[in-house]
């Protein structure tokens, strides 16, 4: 549109006809809500990162005066601000909740969530109903973050602040490790649930809570029980009972104040965060030793969450019109509970009160279900008036620790043995706040505890001389002369390395746990064939190590990766390309005693599109599961594409099928997968009722050519993936394909090599 007259009154920008410009209007996702979310493979690029490309957070953290930061945090704890005054004159309870809710989003099934990237700063977490008032906690921290700049990330600072809060109130913590680098945008890969209302649970459970209207529902009290308790079969990978909660509803299931039923929710959700019963009791009781909840009045007084609040609030949300809107008038959860007589001092008073009184159901001023002690005196201090005392109160979920038989045994033991309680809480708190950091190799700082814990997936430190280039060459020759095929070598290496999850940094080739339970028995690894490969590689390892006289050794973990790399080189050579796959020795072999079988069970892939494997049917499509797997492997869309295409022609399908093996020369590293997938002479049609298998027939003659899965055809169907596939299908692409495949392959093999970084 052109304004020929130069009359500004006719300019569409100034007259409102072009008010909505870049990134506005109806989006692709509005038209096609089930469109494949390839976008999760291009998160956290340099385009969103304001720091220089050569910034190394680990190196920056090493220059931090951690003691000075902790000293400043100690001062902050009792430096009450008029704009958000501290309960009992101490911010400890608020900061413990901030750290807990930062870490507590972690879940074991996919390793996502957790404190590792400072996601509490971004939507949706910054606006969850369970995070009301944590906007204030982070703003209280801003002067300290501002002072130390990029030497400490928000992710580390939030957890450190929780530790200092505990220490400032007389508790000895287990330790602290830095190393959590910030990201600069929300993580779009996390599935938080399908509900479209806050506090909804109708999708994650059968007949669950409907939640509350979108423009309201900022506290759990808004979701009141209707007397029905739905099926408690929580959807995986979720670890929270309702949309916008961290774990459980403190009033009980869907607001039903039943401590026994609540215990079932607690056990399920805390278990999905990797906590056993003892750790769960310790965490709840330890956290509730401090501070209070806030429910001074109805949530009708509370305005919109941060992401929906006005510009003038500058990132604050939940503006409260009741009284002063702060201090004694604060509204957070809608509950009004202070658990102990000394809410700013570590004690055993939580358990003392829990068992000393009988409890009757009551309601907070906001209308939330809570419990009050019967026949008790007012012994609980007021947060802002030293002349006031209150009756002891508890949450429904607190009473679960007394009324659930298993929790009750642990709680009584902690009541009678305060030292055991303190030790259990210190360990559980450390696990809570460090669970998603991965191996100890990532831990930074002087406060890292020396004790090695099983949940850290320990791997022995290198205690021998590493192999050199000549050794690598000789070992490759032995591997290629062992009788093992290229596909066997590549498949074993992929099975070992592809367990890595970028979410919680677990899994990977280091440790060679592919030879141990449970991984050696996973269906996706084709146990019988895997055992053959490992047996021959172990023989090569034993012979090599026995032949050395200078202390040099090769670990099986290194040898598995080296074997895969040798297979890739041979496959490229057989296709006419002379290449070298880079290899860095230094992996070690973990023992069965260093491996938590149950915990590693969560790493078993329900689907691995790279091996054309899918274990069970689910509501999630095969292609969505492929994107999810690629995201966990930290792959970009081009890396996903070139890797899958290369692995197909290398013939490593889990079941040995020819699905997607679009080549007449399997075992050679060629771009045949892409050439044949995009061949217009092939016509595809579903050959299974579930549309998981497709036949590719000659368009002219009808003669069968190929069999494919959804994980194959998506590279011709999805417009973004097809655009990449076309690059690798081009006649000039062979060299690029081989080089890009090797680069992506090496990346996966080294995903857990934090020592190389």
From Swiss-Prot:
Record note on cofactor: Binds 1 heme b (iron(II)-protoporphyrin IX) group per dimer.
Keywords for the protein's UniProt record, in alphabetical order: Heme, Hydrogen peroxide, Iron, Metal-binding, Oxidoreductase, Peroxidase
EC assignment: 1.11.1.21
Amino acids binding heme b: 288
Top-rank EC class of the record's enzyme: oxidoreductase
Top-rank lineage group of the source organism: Bacteria
Reactions listed under catalytic activity: H2O2 + AH2 = A + 2 H2O; 2 H2O2 = O2 + 2 H2O
Required cofactor(s): heme b
Keyword Oxidoreductase applies: yes
Placement of covalent cross-link Tryptophyl-tyrosyl-methioninium (Tyr-Met) (with W-100): 247-273
Example of a GO biological process term: cellular response to hydrogen peroxide
GO cellular component, one term: cytosol
Active site (catalytic residues): 101
Molecular function terms, GO-annotated: catalase activity; heme binding; metal ion binding
Pfam families noted in UniProt: peroxidase
Family: Belongs to the peroxidase family. Peroxidase/catalase subfamily.
Task of the protein: Bifunctional enzyme with both catalase and broad-spectrum peroxidase activity.
Quaternary structure annotation from Swiss-Prot or TrEMBL: Homodimer or homotetramer.
Listed name of the protein: Catalase-peroxidase
Organism: Flavobacterium johnsoniae (strain ATCC 17061 / DSM 2064 / JCM 8514 / BCRC 14874 / CCUG 350202 / NBRC 14942 / NCIMB 11054 / UW101) (Cytophaga johnsonae)
Recorded name of the encoding gene: katG
């Amino acid at each position: 549109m052109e304004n020929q007259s130069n009359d500004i009154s006719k300019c569409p920008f100034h007259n409102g006809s072009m008010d909505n410009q870049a990134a506005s209007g109806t989006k692709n996702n509005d038209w096609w809500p089930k469109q494949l979310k390839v976008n999760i493979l291009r998160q956290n690029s340099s385009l969103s990162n304001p720091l220089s490309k050569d910034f190394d957070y680990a190196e920056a953290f090493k220059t931090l005066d951690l003691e000075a930061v902790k000293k400043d945090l100690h001062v902050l704890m009792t430096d009450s601000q008029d704009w958000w005054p501290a309960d009992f004159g101490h911010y400890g309870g608020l900061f413990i909740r901030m750290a807990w809710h930062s870490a507590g989003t972690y879940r074991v099934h996919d390793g996502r969530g957790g404190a590792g990237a400072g996601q509490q700063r971004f939507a949706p977490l910054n606006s969850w109903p369970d995070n009301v008032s944590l906007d204030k906690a982070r703003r209280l921290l801003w002067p300290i973050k501002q002072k130390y700049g990029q030497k400490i990330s928000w992710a580390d600072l939030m957890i450190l602040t929780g530790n200092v809060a505990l220490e400032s109130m007389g508790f000895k913590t287990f330790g602290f490790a830095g190393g959590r680098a910030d990201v600069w945008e929300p993580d779009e890969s996390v599935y938080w649930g399908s509900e479209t209302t806050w506090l909804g649970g109708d999708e994650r459970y059968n007949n669950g809570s409907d939640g509350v209207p979108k423009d309201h529902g900022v506290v759990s009290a808004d979701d009141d029980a209707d007397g029905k308790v739905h099926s408690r079969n929580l959807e995986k990978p979720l670890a929270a009972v309702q949309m916008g909660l961290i774990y459980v509803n403190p009033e009980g299931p869907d607001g039903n104040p039943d401590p026994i039923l609540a215990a079932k929710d607690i056990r399920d959700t805390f278990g999905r965060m990797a906590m056993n019963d003892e750790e769960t009791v310790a965490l709840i009781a330890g956290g509730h030793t401090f501070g209070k909840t806030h429910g001074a009045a109805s949530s009708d007084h509370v305005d919109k969450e941060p992401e929906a609040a006005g510009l003038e609030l500058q990132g604050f949300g939940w503006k409260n019109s009741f009284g002063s809107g702060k201090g004694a008038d604060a509204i957070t959860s809608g509950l009004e509970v202070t658990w102990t007589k000394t809410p700013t001092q570590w004690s055993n008073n939580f358990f003392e009160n829990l068992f000393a009184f009988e409890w009757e159901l009551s309601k907070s001023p906001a209308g939330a279900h809570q419990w009050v002690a019967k026949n008790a005196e007012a012994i609980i201090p007021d947060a802002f008036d030293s002349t006031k005392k209150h009756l002891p109160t508890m949450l429904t979920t607190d009473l679960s620790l007394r009324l659930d038989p298993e929790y009750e045994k642990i709680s009584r033991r902690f009541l009678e043995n305060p030292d055991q309680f303190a030790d259990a809480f210190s360990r559980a708190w450390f696990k809570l706040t460090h669970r998603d950091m991965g191996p100890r190799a990532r831990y930074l700082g002087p406060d890292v505890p020396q004790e090695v814990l099983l949940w850290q997936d320990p791997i022995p430190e290198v205690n021998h001389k590493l192999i050199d280039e000549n050794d690598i060459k000789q070992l490759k020759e032995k591997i290629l002369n062992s009788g093992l095929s290229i596909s066997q070598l590549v498949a074993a290496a992929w099975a070992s390395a592809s367990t890595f999850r970028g979410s919680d940094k677990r899994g990977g080739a280091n440790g060679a746990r592919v030879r141990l339970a449970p991984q050696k028995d996973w269906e996706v690894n084709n146990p019988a064939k895997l055992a053959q490969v490992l047996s021959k590689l172990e023989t090569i390892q034993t012979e090599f190590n026995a032949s050395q006289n200078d202390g040099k050794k090769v670990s099986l973990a290194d040898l598995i990766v080296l074997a895969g790399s040798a297979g890739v080189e041979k496959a490229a050579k057989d296709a006419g390309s002379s290449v070298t796959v880079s290899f860095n020795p230094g992996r070690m072999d973990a023992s069965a005693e260093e491996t938590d079988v149950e915990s590693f069970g969560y790493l078993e892939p329900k689907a691995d599109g790279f091996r054309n494997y899918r274990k069970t049917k689910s509501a999630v499509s095969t292609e969505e599961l492929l994107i999810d797997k690629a995201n966990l492997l930290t792959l970009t869309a081009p890396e996903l594409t070139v890797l899958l295409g290369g692995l197909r022609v290398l013939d490593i399908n889990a079941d040995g099928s020819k699905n997607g093996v679009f080549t007449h020369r399997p075992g050679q590293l060629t771009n045949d997968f892409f050439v044949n997938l995009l061949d217009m002479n092939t016509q595809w049609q579903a050959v299974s009722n579930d549309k998981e298998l497709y036949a590719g027939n000659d368009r002219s003659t009808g003669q069968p050519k190929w069999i494919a899965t959804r994980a194959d055809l998506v590279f011709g169907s999805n417009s973004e993936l097809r655009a990449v596939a076309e690059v690798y299908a081009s006649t000039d692409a062979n060299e690029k394909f081989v080089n890009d495949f090797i680069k992506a392959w090496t990346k996966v093999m080294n995903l857990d090599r934090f020592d190389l970084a």
